[in-house]
Amino acid sequence: MTRSLGGAELATSIRNDASVAAAALNDLGTRPKLAVVQATDDESTAWYVRSIASAAKRTGILCDIVDLGAAASTEQIRSTLVELGHDPDVHGIILQTPLPDGTDLDALREAINPAKDVDGANPVSLGRLVARLPAFAPATAQAVIALLDHHGISPHARTATVVGRSTVVGSPVAHLLVQRNATVTVCHRHTTDLAAGTRDADILVVAVGIPGLITADHVADGAVVIDVGTTATADGQLLGDVDAAAVDGRAGALTPVPGGVGPVTTALLLNHTVDAAGTQYAQTRSESVLAGFRSSV
């Protein structure tokens, strides 16, 4: 029987910690605030963004949904991100995808203030992650590691395969696993024999957005399988990248979809926002003290 690696309990714990920290900052006169920028008429995306806002409210975090519409240009989105980056009342910024066709996503990610980049999208954040310097990791990638830790699964000295190499999940997950001393293989669309790259892995992370891609043939006996994929169907179901029925009994453990990585990702975004608010509060206080000192001499 395959063990289910649910994320609800961990997500609740993370949100509770964030709520306590948010309340402490509120007592100091700083209310953590998250801004989510979207430019799409995709209803599943709008639902996801609303779920973030709802979770933020329950955690004591303000959340502004900045909806620029599906016709927004790169420059419109970029100027909004820059403005939010300079707004002292905004502590965290998320650029939600998908975006309109033709949008320069790289330019937009570069426009996110790294101090407020709570989803680790800016190249500065990603570079610091690779260099093992303090930075916010992409929340979904961090959620994968957090789930492993929560369920007592150590990547140390184990083999891991990551299917997918996006800058928001696959690549950062691979780096985080290496930092935890796993031996990591990355597979992608140009991998000629996917099963050859996955079937010997102790830990298999799948993040490509192709429902049912991974079957029993891709999974080693007893492997830990982390399914990051979430594809919405026309009737409102969420499907993972792993054929859960096919790997049941073969995989040692599997994250459910929904209810696995997703809730932890949202909780970490809120936790990052509170952390960013605390850092920005401390920096402002330090600057105020320094200004007061300078004016007295």
UniProtKB/Swiss-Prot annotation:
Family: Belongs to the tetrahydrofolate dehydrogenase/cyclohydrolase family.
EC number(s) given by UniProt: 1.5.1.5, 3.5.4.9
Descriptive protein name: Bifunctional protein FolD 1
Subunit structure comment from the entry: Homodimer.
Hydrolase among keywords: yes
One Gene Ontology term of the molecular function aspect: methylenetetrahydrofolate dehydrogenase (NADP+) activity
Pathway in which the depicted protein is active: One-carbon metabolism; tetrahydrofolate interconversion
Keyword Cell inner membrane in record: no
Top-level taxon: Bacteria
UniProt-listed PANTHER family: C-1-TETRAHYDROFOLATE SYNTHASE, CYTOPLASMIC (PTHR48099:SF5), C-1-TETRAHYDROFOLATE SYNTHASE, CYTOPLASMIC-RELATED (PTHR48099)
Residues annotated for NADP(+) binding in this entry: 164-166, 230
Function: Catalyzes the oxidation of 5,10-methylenetetrahydrofolate to 5,10-methenyltetrahydrofolate and then the hydrolysis of 5,10-methenyltetrahydrofolate to 10-formyltetrahydrofolate.
Catalytic function, reaction form: (6R)-5,10-methylene-5,6,7,8-tetrahydrofolate + NADP(+) = (6R)-5,10-methenyltetrahydrofolate + NADPH; (6R)-5,10-methenyltetrahydrofolate + H2O = (6R)-10-formyltetrahydrofolate + H(+)
Organism expressing this protein natively: Rhodococcus jostii (strain RHA1)
HAMAP family from the UniProt entry: THF_DHG_CYH
A Pfam short name: THF_DHG_CYH_C
Any GO CC annotation of this UniProt entry: cytosol
Keywords tagged on the record: Amino-acid biosynthesis, Histidine biosynthesis, Hydrolase, Methionine biosynthesis, Multifunctional enzyme, NADP, One-carbon metabolism, Oxidoreductase, Purine biosynthesis
Any one Gene Ontology BP term: purine nucleotide biosynthetic process
